[in-house]
Structures are given as structure tokens and as C-alpha cells.
């Protein structure tokens, strides 16, 4: 009996287990959990089982009157509960993995952004460093430029000082050129005046009385009262030719001769008797009778006549006089050209071969309308008292001692060539230009080349002229050089002709 009871109980329990319907279980997330696969095959329950009725009975809250139903999990077996937990964990794991993937994606995006930001920051840093380096270089360049500006300023200051010195030098040169031009003008005017006075002073006693004038008329305006003084047109051509005036003679001999004549004239002014006493002296032992001595003697006698302004007899024999006058006579004798004296003497010897041979003899020349033959005087020296001529129109006789030396005739032939050369040189006109045009052009242009080069090379400041006065003058002379040379040549030819006419 007992065995049957236990078997019936086991069968009822197994039937219960088999007849238990599948229960839908909801987890905490609201998901339905299915029954186990092991119970699926045995679950052929009937309608009379009490468990399904309960579940169907308490499905609504209004049915159980506010009492919460028990969780369906408590009716599951532990294995089913484990399965449910595993499923729940898998779902959570899946959600977590999805979240992790999303966060990894976000992290990747953030990393990408960070890398971009880093790159941008690096670029900005590079730009900043480059800007700092450029700033440093710019500061260095600014310093260098400041140094360059300072050096340029110093150089400009030095150049300005140099330019000021150059301008001062240029002004000095301009002043020198102006002074030179002025002096040249004065010299040209003086030469022209000397030529004019030389032509008019053909009968001056200190210059024009040569040995040839002893045998001709005296053309002094003071002696000949009917002629005007200083007028070359009133002087005959033969008188001017015999006067032997040379415009280019030395000034020293002229002044010394004038001093001699002034001394004689002062001696005449002292008084008539004193002049007659002083005018009679003898230089025989000290000065032998020579051509120069005769020339000076005749010049002094003519000066005495010019100062007295009267026609008087002039004595030819002299006594010893003051040593000052003798010194002057020595200087004048040394200043005279010996060659011209010898040539004149030789020509005179040829013209007058029949003259007296006595060294103490003299020749009397009558100054009048027509020259007369020389009158030889063979007597010794005698003292003559000057007497006033009552008739001023009568001629005046001048007595000059003559020395006939044989050595002079021999020396005249030796000095003829030198005299001809000197006379030709004196006849040549003065010319400031050369024979070739190119030489004159180079002489005018070459001194202006450094100034022009300096003006072209230097930096011209505002208001500074681009020309130099000296270079401008030279440029004008260069342009008009041909005309200047032609005008100068045309001016020098008439002067040469006039001077040649006044010479012997």
C-alpha cells in the first residue's frame, strides 16, 4: 500500500510538472522571459490545473483589489533565473559596448580635433617665432640703416665743407681772372698809348737823336716853333725815318736819358749865365770821342734848347762837371745798343767819306728849312758864349765833335748780322696767338676740363648754378675763337706797319 501511495504521489507531481503552463515572465526592464526548453515538451497541461487559473485570475489590478502580484521570477526555477540573469547581463553588455563604441568615436573625434588644434597651435607658434625673428632682423636693419644714415650725414658734411672750399677757390680764381683780364686791358691800352706817343714823339731829344740826325735837320717841336708839339702828322717822313725811333726799346734807357735831359734843363732854369757856364765842360780825358758820346751830347744840347724855349748858340767844348751827371752818362752809354751804334757809324762813314780825320775837329749842322753841307772846323776847342738870337726864324747851328776811329769800321761788319736779326725781331708784331688753330683751341679748352668734370660728377644742390664763370668764359672764347684770332691778327698788322715805318 505504501509503495502504491509513493508512486501515485510521484506521478501526480510529475503530472503537475508536466501540466504547468508556460508563464510569461517580465524582467525589471519589461521584457518577457520564455519558459525553459526542457518544460516545453512536457507542458501539456489541462484546464483543470489550478496554477493557470491563478495567473489568469490576477492579471488585473482591479481583480486583486490593490495588492501587488508577486514577481514571476519567484515562480521560476533557479536555472531559469540564471538564464534570465544571463540574458539581462548580455543586454546590458551590449548596451555598454554600444556606449563604449560611441564614446570611442567621440574620443577619436576629440583626438582629431586636438591634433588639429595642436597643428594650428604649432603653426601659430611658428608664425610667432618667425615674427619675432623678423622683428629682430628689422631692428638690426634699422640699426644698420641708422649707422648708414649717420655715416652719410658725416660724409655730406665733409663734402659740403669741401664744396665750400671749392667755391672759395673758384671765387679766388674768378677774381684772379678778372684781375688778369683787367691788367691785360690796361696793358693793351698802355701799349696802344705808347705806340701813339712813340709815333708823336719822333723828335724827342732823349730818344730820337742818333748819329744820322747830326747830318740832318733837328725835328724837335721845341726847336722848330712853327710845328705843334706831339703831332706826328706835322713831322716829315724823312725826319721820322732819321730819328731812329724804335717803339720796343728798353724803358730803362728812356728814363735815364730823360733824367739827363731834366738835369740839363734844371741847370738852364737856374739862370742864363749859370746855364752857359754849366753847359761848357770838357769830358775829353774821361770820355773819349765816340759815337755814343756824340749821341748823348747832341741829345743834351737839344734838351737845353727845348728848356730855354729860345734859339741860342750851343757850345761844343766842355769843361769838367758834376760826377752825378757823369754817372748818368755812363749808365745811358751802357744802355744803348752797341750794334745799332756801330751800324749807324758805318753808314755815316759810307755817306761822308771826305770828312775830317782830326779827332779834335767838329761838324756844324744848321737847323733850318734845308740841310746844308757840314762845315769842318780844324781849330782846337774854344769856349763859346751863348747869345740870344734876335730873329727866331733863323736856323740854329749845333756843333758836335766827331771821332773817326778805324776800329769801329772793322767791328761794324762783324755786328751787321746781329743788327739785322735784332731789327727783324723788333719789326715783328706782338701776337698772343700761335700759328696753328688747334694749339690755341687746346690752350683755351684744356684748363676748363677739370672744372667741367667736377661739376658733372658732384651732386648739384637746389639753387646751385650748373655753370662756372671761368668755364663759361672759356666756352665763349672757344665758340668765338676763330673770330678772335682773325680780329687779333687784323689789329696786329696795322700796328706792325706803323712801327716798321718809325724804325730805320
UniProtKB/Swiss-Prot annotation:
Residues 1-74, 191-244 are annotated as: Disordered. It comes from the Eukaryota. Residues 7-26, 33-49 have a biased composition (Low complexity). InterPro entries: Syntaphilin/Syntabulin (IPR028197). Residues 79-161 form a coiled coil. One of its GO terms (cellular component) is presynaptic membrane. The keyword Coiled coil applies. Residues 207-217 have a biased composition (Polar residues). It is found in: Membrane; Synapse, Synaptosome. The keyword Phosphoprotein applies. The modification Phosphoserine is found at residues 200, 204, 219. Pfam families: Syntaphilin (PF15290). Keywords: Coiled coil, Membrane, Phosphoprotein, Synapse, Synaptosome, Transmembrane, Transmembrane helix. It is a single-pass membrane protein. GO terms for biological process: neuron differentiation. Inhibits SNARE complex formation by absorbing free STX1A. Binds to STX1A. Interacts with DNM1; this interaction inhibits the binding of DNM1 to AMPH and DNM1-receptor-mediated endocytosis. This is Syntaphilin. It comes from Rattus norvegicus (Rat).
